[in-house]
Amino acid sequence: MRMSERKIIARSLSRRSALALAAASLVGAKAAHAHHGWSGFDSGQVLRLNGRIAAMTFDNPHGELRLTTAGGEWSIELAPPSRMVARGLSREMLALGTDATVEGYPHRQTARLMRAERIVVAGKTTELR
């Protein structure tokens, strides 16, 4: 292989690598923005929901509840599990069928989606933020 052919191949690989890296960066940035973009929630409107836990995840990046209320079912975004545990809220406290009160901000566009600021379970209030 001649020197000029090697340069063309090296340039081609460099361009492909650069494009692949750029594409991966954009995907990662979009995912991070989608998850961490709390601006979609209306912090000027605080809601207080009372209901029963119908489903729960206690996983990273944050826990989630499905809360059945008199007005319908809500999806509740909680804090990361490590923060909840550090503040005294365990996975066991969020068992299915448990009554809970959640205060937080509704999503501006998605109906019945809330970012929780605090949760009350069995008379214990846990600050999530």
What spans do the regions from the language model cover?
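OB-fold/S1-family single-stranded nucleic acid-binding modules
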Residues: Q109-L128
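Short, surface-exposed secondary-structure boundary micro-motifs
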Residues: Y105-P106
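Short aromatic-glycine-enriched beta-strand elements
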Residues: N60-L67
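N-terminal secretory signal peptides
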Residues: M1-L13, S17-G28
